[in-house]
């Protein structure tokens, strides 16, 4: 430390600022309507300094000068990527609804079984500013030749198998203040007669 600091008797410790680094960051919201009714603020940046960022078991998180939470912080090498969540975005509301779900025999000749499902995700921006949002949904995938899975979405998904995770799809939307976006996903799962889907 450049200067000595004082620690009060019986205190757990003291905080001292060692350095300050600033990076240009992409700030967006990540939403998983099937799991949560709230989206979360994410900041993504590159460590453009010539030094690594040290890991911390506890880091305080601030947004516009206000403390929003605490989190662990992993070490980041020079030139490495930083991705950090900064708590929920209360002005983004998420809804998830199953519109149709059916199962049974399909076809008079082929005698195949099928299950269909249609879901709708609704994202509403109650803030007075626009938000860029990554919306994620998990869909089933097949590891057997006899099991056929087809799906469509409106609007079309921007990415499939996100981060090499099979069945994870993503939409990238920009939502103006006060605007609402709906996403629908239809799935059809087919399997031969005589087999049981588990």
Label each residue range with its predicted role.
Residues 1-120, 129-163, 168, 175-198:
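Intrinsically disordered, low-complexity Ser/Thr/Pro/Gly-rich interaction regions
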């Amino acid at each position: 430390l450049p200067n000595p600091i004082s620690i009060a008797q019986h205190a757990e410790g003291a905080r001292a600022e060692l350095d300050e680094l600033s990076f240009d960051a992409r700030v967006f919201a990540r939403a998983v309507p099937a799991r949560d009714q709230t989206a979360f603020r994410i900041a993504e940046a590159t460590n453009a300094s010539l030094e690594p960022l040290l890991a911390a078991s506890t880091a305080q998180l601030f947004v516009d000068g206000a403390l929003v939470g605490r989190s662990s912080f992993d070490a980041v090498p020079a030139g490495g990527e930083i991705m950090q969540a900064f708590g929920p975005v209360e002005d983004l509301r998420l809804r998830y609804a199953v519109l149709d779900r059916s199962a049974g025999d399909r076809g008079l000749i082929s005698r195949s079984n099928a299950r269909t499902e249609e879901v709708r995700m609704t994202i509403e921006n109650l803030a007075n500013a626009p938000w860029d949002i990554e919306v994620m949904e998990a869909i089933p995938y097949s590891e057997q030749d006899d099991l056929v899975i087809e799906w469509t979405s409106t609007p079309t998904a921007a990415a499939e198998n996100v981060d090499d995770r099979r069945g994870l799809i993503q939409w990238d939307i920009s939502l103006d203040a006060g605007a609402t976006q709906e996403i629908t996903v239809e799935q059809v799962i087919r399997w031969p007669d005589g087999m049981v889907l588990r």
